[in-house]
Amino acid sequence: MSYTEIVAFKNQESNHTKDVKNAFRGAMAVWGLMEEKHLALKSAPWDPTQKLSRTSLMDPNGVKEIWELANNKDVPIDERIVMATTFDRVVVKRENFDKIIKAMRSFDKTYEGKSSILEQADIIESFIQDEDIDAVAWNQTSVNSNPWFDWSEEKEEEVPYNLSKNKDHWFLFDDLVFI
């Protein structure tokens, strides 16, 4: 079964992961729950009377509409923050762990535990105990390679992603204007 990986960074390098079973309960659940609450379902192209989610229609523009909820000021801020955690290459610095945990717990309460967000919040909260952990990130599904570990041709092995040296990431509370 697939899983969502929560990646801990120590001294700016990806260090280890904690897994949350069933990746479908992560990003896909967040997208579906928020779509259901904030957007009208779409008509199926083959039957306009049948209403379907944007993800089930595999409509790239429809999925973008879901992602845009992160910028929609009518959507509660905690929900927008959680939506942003589902985006590629997002990182949350230690100084913002309390904010992300609060947002995740609020999201879980709003959506009555219909996702793995509470489990993710618990993992991040456990990271607070380790003062060497300076950031967290997500690999939303284990069916792909983890973007937080690079391949070294020279060493012929996986090497940690470094937040100071590598630049293919962004910081949730620094780089998005909506927060």
Placement of each model-derived feature along the sequence:
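Acidic (Asp/Glu-rich) sequence patches and key acidic residues
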Residues: M1-I179
